[in-house]
Amino acid sequence: MLLHYILKAYMKTTLIQLSPHQMSNESLVPWGRLFFQVIDLQIPKDAVPADEDERERCEWWKAKKWAYATLGRLYRRYGDPSQLPSTLKEDYGAFADSFVNTFAPEIIKVFLHQVELYVSGRVWLSKKCQYHIFTFFSDCIKPKSTWHLIKPHFETLVSSFVYPQMSFTHAKVELWDTDPVDLVRQQVGKRACKPAAFGFKLTTSQMMVIISIPPSLLQRPSSSSW
């Protein structure tokens, strides 16, 4: 399948700069729609391996990984005017203003929907896709323009998605018993999920919400409400 190579190639073109064409709506909108369609694609079970490690490496999930990564990269590098380096403001200032107001809200909506599906058990997410979701949400916390879109979902996002990543689950216990080196690699490796990075960027009031979550989880059945 060529799709994941196409998405990977596009991602690589954004690493250093965006061309005027890439910043135009004639290019950005259709590419954005493609990324959203790939992320939203419901993959039939018989189209991917049953083994989760093999599924991580299959073409469909590589395509999804590059879709998540590219959307996050566009926002983090070029699309957030409040975090744009002064050396880039002249070339990308206008693009960032447009991106954060028109495109970033759609990315947030799509990512939140995938998290909702994941925590409710309706879809599976690869570890690398989760990594890119965590990274994107971490980048969206500080800027007011994106934080106000995430804030209504904040408590549920932390309790249902972030906190479980920090918990020592039965699967992690088994891996610790059989291969502790692999467990450490997964938790601190380059592509490990980033709940810690998410937490570091929170204000004191937001941190108080997080601190109250573990006791509340012990007092009620596991559930999610979006």
Which residues does each predicted region cover?
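Short sequence/structural elements of tandem HEAT/ARM alpha-solenoid repeats
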Residues: 21-37, 48, 81-94, 98-113, ...
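Eukaryotic non-catalytic interaction scaffolds in large regulatory proteins
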Residues: 1-2, 6, 14-15, 19-31, ...
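Alpha-helical scaffold segments in carbohydrate-active enzymes
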Residues: 5, 37, 66, 73, ...
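Structural signature of alpha-helical solenoid repeat scaffolds
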Residues: 4-16, 72, 76, 138-139, ...
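Extended, noncatalytic alpha-helical scaffold/tether regions
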Residues: 6, 10, 30, 38, ...
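Internal amphipathic alpha-helical repeat/solenoid segments
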Residues: 47-59
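Alpha-helical repeat/alpha-solenoid scaffolds of the HEAT/ARM/MIF4G superfamily
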Residues: 14, 22-25, 41, 45, ...
